[in-house]
Amino acid sequence: MEFSDTTYSWSGKTVLIVEDNETSNIYFEAALRKTKANLVWAKNGLDAVEMVKKNNQINLILMDINMPKLDGIEATRIIKGLFPEIIIVVQTAFILSGEERLCVDAGCDEFITKPIRLKYLLDTINRYLASPKET
């Protein structure tokens, strides 16, 4: 799917992508690069928590659930406890019974299942990052 450079414009916004799968990272980078958002990465929940503590410019986190060291649910709980204003969009390929409820209880703002449709991903993020006049 193609979109113009102005369809989704998040210049000045920082998106942290927390994902341990290299293929998913390539997809997210390709999907988000035209948005002009500053993209940063963490390979697991523990790294994400540390990065958020050090970088107060993060506006939105795209968080995987199943990762080593610290899973996305616990990372979400910790980050939301420290910085409730950061938007967290959880994305996962595994739908276990009650998993979405656990994510919501941990504080996630959105829950997306893989495979992720590009337009749905961009529209979801845009709800949080677009300037008021753009929504």
Task: Give the residues covered by each predicted segment.
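Conserved acidic carboxylate
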Residues: 19
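Active-site beta3 strand of CheY-like receiver
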Residues: 56-62
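Receiver (REC) domain active-site loop signature in two-component systems and cognate sites
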Residues: 67
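C-terminal output helix
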Residues: 116-125
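Short hydrophobic/Thr-rich beta-strand motif most characteristic of the beta2 strand and flanking loop
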Residues: 36-43, 51, 112
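Charged docking surfaces used in two-component/phosphorelay signaling
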Residues: 26-34
